[in-house]
């Protein structure tokens, strides 16, 4: 019988701190890392690089099935490697984002990327960052964490992040956008944003990131021991 590599899934809403937590867990455990939120952007960039017709589901499916992508946690930063090239910044452009939205509309593309995400499950283990990792992608994962925080706290974090990059942002507008996205994510008919029944729910509203990492790491090590 084949023994599957263990998986730690980290799900939760935008701005809860999933990315930071997953990078820390991957570095601490020396495990593989999957950033599911970046997968569609990576596919979009690959399509642009290879001049694949983004409006053609038939053209996108083979590209999605064989997407050559790796995620590397290094010194607290996430590197996205597409076909051996660091595209961490390139996938964040508006053009790539728009293309990613188009690609995500195709059911067979989503199915191909679901299989591709599951292929990240390799020894010694995988840290999977997303919204439906514990409920849809890896329902048999031994360690599931749902990281949450109040909408106000997440808006505050996002505002400070954007201000640090030199952007002038409005808190109320950010808060409204986050609440709208939460409503969409939690009420969608397919893979809604909900904690898995067996997930540890961590509310990071009143916690520092170091406290979140320590709690999650202790929980993972306890389950995996």
UniProtKB/Swiss-Prot annotation:
Repressor as UniProt keyword: no
Molecular function terms from GO: ATP binding; CMP kinase activity; dCMP kinase activity
EC number: 2.7.4.25
GO BP: nucleobase-containing small molecule interconversion; pyrimidine nucleotide metabolic process
Chain positions recorded as ATP binding sites: 12-20
Keywords associated with the record: ATP-binding, Cytoplasm, Kinase, Nucleotide-binding, Transferase
Organism: Pectobacterium atrosepticum (strain SCRI 1043 / ATCC BAA-672) (Erwinia carotovora subsp. atroseptica)
Protein name: Cytidylate kinase
UniProt superkingdom: Bacteria
PANTHER family found in the cross-reference section: CYTIDYLATE KINASE, CYTIDYLATE KINASE/PANTOATE-BETA-ALANINE LIGASE
């Amino acid at each position: 019988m084949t023994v599957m590599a263990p998986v730690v899934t980290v799900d939760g809403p935008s701005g809860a701190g999933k990315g930071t937590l997953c990078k820390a867990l991957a570095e601490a455990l020396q495990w593989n890392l999957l950033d599911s939120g970046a997968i569609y952007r990576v596919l979009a960039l690959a399509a642009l690089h290879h001049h694949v017709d983004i409006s053609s589901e038939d053209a996108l499916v083979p590209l999605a099935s064989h997407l050559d992508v790796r995620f590397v946690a290094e010194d607290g930063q996430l590197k996205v490697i597409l076909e051996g090239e660091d595209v961490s910044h390139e996938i964040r452009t508006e053009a790539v984002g728009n293309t990613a939205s188009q690609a995500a509309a195709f059911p067979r593309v989503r199915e191909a990327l679901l299989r591709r995400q599951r292929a990240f499950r390799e020894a010694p283990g995988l840290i999977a960052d997303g919204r439906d990792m514990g409920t849809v992608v890896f329902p048999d994962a031994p360690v599931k964490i749902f990281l949450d925080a109040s909408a106000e706290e997440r808006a505050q974090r996002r505002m400070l992040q954007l201000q640090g990059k030199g952007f002038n942002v409005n808190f109320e507008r950010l808060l409204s956008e986050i609440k709208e996205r939460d409503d969409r994510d939690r009420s969608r008919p397919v893979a809604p944003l909900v904690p898995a029944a067996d997930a540890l729910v961590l509310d990071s509203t009143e916690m520092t990131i170091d406290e979140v990492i320590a709690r999650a790491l202790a929980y993972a090590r306890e389950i995996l021991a």
